From Swiss-Prot:
It is an enzyme of class 7 (translocase). NDH is composed of at least 16 different subunits, 5 of which are encoded in the nucleus. NCBIfam families: ndhI, NuoI, PRK05888.1-3. Belongs to the complex I 23 kDa subunit family. NDH shuttles electrons from NAD(P)H:plastoquinone, via FMN and iron-sulfur (Fe-S) centers, to quinones in the photosynthetic chain and possibly in a chloroplast respiratory chain. The immediate electron acceptor for the enzyme in this species is believed to be plastoquinone. Couples the redox reaction to proton translocation, and thus conserves the redox energy in a proton gradient. This is NAD(P)H-quinone oxidoreductase subunit I, chloroplastic. The gene is ndhI. [4Fe-4S] cluster 2 binds at residues 74, 104, 107, 110. [4Fe-4S] cluster 1 binds at residues 64, 67, 70, 114. It catalyses: a plastoquinone + NADH + (n+1) H(+)(in) = a plastoquinol + NAD(+) + n H(+)(out); a plastoquinone + NADPH + (n+1) H(+)(in) = a plastoquinol + NADP(+) + n H(+)(out).
Length: 181
């Protein structure tokens, strides 16, 4: 008889503890209902990238001296530099320059080590296509400057995530670790 009463008491204590945990979760849910949404409605609102953002690479054909430093410092030897040697002036003349952004890891080494600064990083990050071969940019496509997010009339820009009510989110004050069962 005592075993049955002890079992019933243990069961009721576990049920009450489970109800408390469910109640704590519900309090957290209610606490978040008063906050502004944290998501950005992407196609209509765009986040302005920082100045150091590493987006698509911009290339200036006239500045390039075909030294191939960008190929040597690239961890995956990605830029393809085609050149021919002009015998009359004994200099390399650039014929073609291309980068495949389907393979590029956007490390920025090519931009950093370029001696003539013909490469630069833009703030363009929308590189999605249905065919991966469209991501192989030649010198003409690399030379086009993208439309700035601030100048795009179809979108609303968000300068950062500082529109949240409390700034950086912190844990719930009543949160406990779930180590005791």
């Amino acid at each position: 008889m005592f075993a049955m009463v002890n079992g019933l008491r243990s069961y009721s204590q576990q049920a009450i503890q489970a109800a408390r945990y469910i109640g704590q979760g519900f309090v957290v849910t209610l606490d978040h209902m008063n906050r502004l949404p944290m998501t950005i409605q992407y196609p209509y609102e765009k986040l302005i990238p920082s100045e150091r953002f590493r987006g698509r690479i911009h290339f200036e054909f006239d500045k390039c001296i075909a030294c191939e430093v960008c190929v040597r410092v690239c961890p995956i030897n990605l830029p393809v530099v085609d050149w021919e040697l002009k015998e009359s002036v004994r200099k390399k003349q650039l014929k073609n320059y291309s980068i495949d952004f389907a393979v590029c890891i956007f490390c920025g080494n090519c931009v950093e080590y370029c001696p003539t600064n013909c490469l630069s990083m833009t703030e363009e990050y929308e590189l999605s296509t249905y065919d991966r071969h469209e991501l192989n940019y030649d010198q003409i496509a690399l030379g086009r400057l993208p439309v700035s997010v601030v100048q795009d009339p179809t979108t609303q820009t968000v300068s950062g995530l500082n529109y949240l009510s409390k700034g950086v989110m912190e844990g719930h004050p009543d949160s406990r670790s779930v180590t005791n069962f």
